Structure formats: C-alpha cells, structure tokens
Amino acid sequence: YDTEPVREKGDTTIYSDVGAIMLGELIEKESGLPLDMFVDSLIFEPLGMSTTFYNPPEEKIKRVVPTEIDPKGNLIHGYVHDENAHSLGGVAGHAGLFSTAKDLAIFSQMMLNRGLYGWKRIFKQETVDLFTTRANLVSQSSRCLGWDSPSGASSGGIYLSDLSYGHGGYT
C-alpha cells in the first residue's frame, strides 16, 4: 500500500491490531506451525491450560460465555467476533482466544513470576520484563510491547498500581 503517514514518527501512539497480527504470522512462518498449535504446545499445554483455545470445539462451547449479540439478535457463543480475527479463520495474534478464569489465573501467575509457573519456565525473565515495561517510543505513552500500563486515561483510572499491566479486548 502506498499511503502517507497521518502523524509524524514519535508524535502519538494509536492502538492497532496490525502489530499483533503480524507477530502471529511471523510465529507461523518461523516455527512452521499454525499459531494455534504453536501456543498450545509451547504455552497452554505446559501450563496445564486445558480450557484455552481458538475456535472452541463443539463439546466445549457450553463453557464459553456469550459476549455479543449479532445483528439478528442472537447471542454469539464460542465464535470469534473480532472482524480481523474472523477473516483469518478465528486464529490470529491479536484476538480469537477463549479461556476460563482458572486458565487465566494460571497464565497471570506465570506472568507475575516473570515467566515461571511451578518449575516450568515458559518465558525468559528478560522477555516478560521487555513485554511489560513501557516502550517509551512516544513521550507520555502508556504502551508496552503487547500490554498497556496504567495511565489516568485507562479504564482502570486511579485504581491500578504503577506496576500493573494488562490488555482489554474481545474475542
């Protein structure tokens, strides 16, 4: 595409799915595995996260909480509703995962332990630090590489610790 930037480099941060989508594509290219198989075998299975998946199988749909209503008034149940992820078959680097509170607690504990859960090392400490520290590519930006950090403008407002990080979104 041949388009001109709408802002000068370093001027502002605008959230976009494109970076995470490209990361998913890069993982597939470099690993030789589809993204869902890659994250399942290297992250979810070692952590025992048995109820986290892309495109939930029919037998697990009943465990998925409906989160949207389609234009006809039907609940969207176990179906990715992010348009970009949908166009990529429900498996993408930025959206499409379904999980449970238990599995999210496991993943969160691993992140709080800087990549370690039990005796299993999932990420290097330096990788977790890199992903959860403000990138400072733009002055006053709260963005980390893959996460967001507290700012007065965030949905958490003043209630989040300066050490917290997270990412809002939907499937």
Predicted regions and their residues:
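Short, small/polar residue-rich loop motifs at catalytic or cofactor-binding pockets
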Residues: G169-T171
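Short, surface-exposed loop or secondary-structure junction motifs
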Residues: Y1-G166
